[in-house]
């Protein structure tokens, strides 16, 4: 989703099970960064699809394989044809195992402009974690409200 000053920042809705899966993936892969794809509709995340982290240094970076990305695009097309749905890959997620859920310069540079991004910060507080959603707005990656739905 690309937003401009002519539109307001969106709320992003996420299914509770998808969010639970993302948190479990982040904890399981620590101290490496985890990563995955978000499937749903614009502004609505229905499913989190874990992918392997192909970065050369997975403790500091993440890289989603193009093979994983295109496999999910094909899967969404099959679902859409079979069920008359409009599912798509709408975003990506990754973790910062020792940090806050703030996008790094690399995160911003490599981000797809039409995606929603979730970052899980496992080091956000003592014993805790924080998740933030981001979308591009006037070509800047901006935080947006993340609403958990059942």
Model-flagged regions — what are they?
Residues 1-89, 97-150:
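Conserved beta-strand-loop surface patch within small alpha/beta domains used
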